[in-house]
UniProtKB/Swiss-Prot annotation:
Miscellaneous notes: Present with 195 molecules/cell in log phase SD medium.
Keyword presence, Coiled coil: yes
Name of the protein this chain belongs to: Cytokinesis protein 2
Location(s), subcellular: Cytoplasm, Cytoskeleton; Bud neck
Annotated GO CC locations: cell cortex; cell division site; cellular bud neck; cellular bud neck contractile ring; cellular bud neck septin ring; cytoplasm; cytoplasmic side of plasma membrane; HICS complex
Entry annotated with the keyword Phosphoprotein: yes
Cited function: Throughout most of the cell cycle it forms a double ring that coincides with the septins. After the onset of mitosis, forms a ring-like structure which colocalizes with the medial actin ring. Mediates cytoskeletal rearrangements required for cytokinesis. In conjunction with the medial actin ring exhibits contraction-like action.
Record note on quaternary structure: Interacts with INN1.
Amino acid sequence: MSYSYEACFWDPNDNGVNILLGHISQGIRSCDSMILFFKQRSELEKDYARRLGAITGKLDKDIGTNMDYGKLNETFNVVLSVEKARAQSHSKQSEILFRQIYTDTKAFAANLQARYTTLSGKIERLRMDKFNKKKGCEVLQKKLQDAQIRFRDLQLNENNMIGAKRVEHNKRELLKWESNSQEYKVQLDVLKQEYKASQKFWIHEWAQLSCELQEMENARISFLQSKLQQFATSSMETYILEQTKMDMLTNHLNSFTAADEISTFSKENGTGRLKHKTSKGDMNSSANWAQMSSISTTSKKTESYMDNIRKLSSQLKETENKRKLASIDKYEKPLPSPEVTMATQFRNSTPVIRNETKVVANPTLSLRSSPVQLQSNVDDSVLRQKPDKPRPIVGEEQLKPDEDSKNPDEKGLMVHKRNQSLSSPSESSSSNPTDFSHIKKRQSMESMTTSVSSMANSIDDSQRFAKSWNSSNRKRKSMSHLQVPSSASSRSDDGGRTPNSAHNLNEDDYNTRRDTSTSTILFKPPVAVRGTSRGHTHRQSMIMQDSSNPIEDALYEMERIQSSSKPGTKTGNIMDERGVVRDRGITVTLPIVTSEGFPVIEYAKAMYPLIGNEAPGLANFHKGDYLLITEIVNKDWYKGEVYDNDRIDRNHRIGLIPYNFIQLLHQGL
């Protein structure tokens, strides 16, 4: 079904005619608004072009009087040409607006008004003719009824008259009203026929007139669309020209620096140079040479470090395969319980794995400050008999072995060369941060560390650790928890202190902590309970000796450790650190929960105001207000609360916050 003026404005009382004529008249009056807009806009563009031309002329005169030097003077000339082009563009736009848009729209609106006046007058005449004939029919019908009633009364009183004169008068009246009734009846029949004819003519004429009104409205809308499109095109041409000129100016500004200008002027207009002493020149060249050699040494160390990592990875895989295949060994040797740390640091934009061994092997650290007493019941002879235990590999990701295709002889030669390179004091401390060969009697601990590291690196983060470990262990970033014995004497002391430490530590103190910001995993194995003999193992391994799937065993053990940890003391220090942000160098303390009790995950500051928007669920705020972010909806929207602004209604103080209106604040002092 199609809708049009010709088909949708028919009714017995002609109400549709009034509605349609009012709509057409309102549209014509709206044209006057656009005519006034185009006129004022053309005057504005003309005045802007005139003023800009005057400013440009003054700038041209000043540049000619006070000339700058070099590239900056060329930049001034570029600015002058850009502004001249801008003034010409706006002058052209003013002419287009006045001559092509304003004038044409004004003439079209006048023609439209004249056409509407003609059509509306014709419609009114037709409607009036139809109305008059209808009204005449009603009047004649009433007269006919009155004449018929009078004739009937006279006819009834004809036999009741006394006297000849009265009878004669009654007859004359009877004949008169009878003739009047006949005449009214004939006139009424004729007028009814004329009224029916006027109705038919109105229907025919209204169909044509409504079609003409529809064509007139269509022409008005199309004309205004074309003129507005012409206005948009002329404005866009001006804006594109301005953008092009501004890009040219920007490129010219980026083509030189202040140092270039100073150097050029000094070169072309310099009058003499000071002679520098040779020693100072030698010193500068020596400093440059030292810097270049330092960079070369760093790159060589990085390459050496990567080679060491690859070699250790190959040794690790080979040792793991031997352990799995060796089913003869039915017991697990008791190992000390160091805390295994995997950390990553970025130094000078180069990934470097932090050497945790230096902290561990520091002789100034005593066993009294360590949170866990190290225990070992392995004698020195057993430790010396297994020198080729794999060393721990510490890092954010364990590198894949790249030497699987080599034969056993080449691998043995590589291991021998690796042991020789690690035995030198210079390489043990700086070349490979993961090497522990310079620390004596560490084979058992290194074996345990290597097995845990290899398994931990092969398990996905999302399967191993819950997100709650992030908040519970951020406060344990300090390296003061890392402390292991570094000499044979400390090992012998551990053996003597094992019973005491077993009484002081609980069996359930088996905590696993992970800090995602530094990729650190800390394992605290349980201490043997009272009554355990020295010959038994003091540490429960995360993997069973004859396990066919060590990764699943390690995963199960980690989940059990996580579920047994106490969550009550995990968020204390983290909540203390939150609420303190930096705003333009000023420390600001904000609440860590909203007024409704929701925890705050981010803090932000409003860079632009968002006021007066009555959309439901949208927060309103002023520029400079602090915002408490409680939820990140997506990359474009946050959800939160406006902090401490009573000028905003309560219904719009909490809701959605657009990301491009705010700036996130960094936490911490």
